[in-house]
């Protein structure tokens, strides 16, 4: 395993641990999720380039599309919660149910 793979794995682990530790605020959770998606994108791009697997060359693009959708939904939830309650706590998401 090369040093690049270990650094990317470590970055994913740090982002995941950040998601577990700072899960009370929605903004912190969204930043950790974006870090995880960025490391997954880099890892999939490196894997496609190293294996010369042309059929899977769309995988990083599809991953970026899902990351953009996740960011848009997360930011809209953040705006809705902060406008409604004035804070960005994740526990306020349970109060948004009809």
UniProtKB/Swiss-Prot annotation:
Keyword Flavoprotein on entry: no
Membrane topology label: Multi-pass membrane protein
EC number from the UniProt entry: 7.1.1.2
Subcellular location, record wording: Mitochondrion inner membrane
Main location as per UniProt: mitochondrion
Pfam families: Oxidored_q2
GO BP terms in the entry: ATP synthesis coupled electron transport
GO annotations of cellular component type: mitochondrial inner membrane; respiratory chain complex I
Domain of life: Eukaryota
InterPro entries assigned to the protein according to its UniProt record, in alphabetical order: NADH_UbQ_OxRdtase_chain4L/K, NUOK/Mnh_C1-like
Transmembrane segments: 1-21, 29-49, 61-81
GO terms for MF: NADH dehydrogenase (ubiquinone) activity
Keywords carried by this UniProt record: Electron transport, Membrane, Mitochondrion, Mitochondrion inner membrane, NAD, Respiratory chain, Translocase, Transmembrane, Transmembrane helix, Transport, Ubiquinone
UniProt function note: Core subunit of the mitochondrial membrane respiratory chain NADH dehydrogenase (Complex I) which catalyzes electron transfer from NADH through the respiratory chain, using ubiquinone as an electron acceptor. Part of the enzyme membrane arm which is embedded in the lipid bilayer and involved in proton translocation.
Protein's UniProt name: NADH-ubiquinone oxidoreductase chain 4L
Organism (species): Pseudosoriculus fumidus
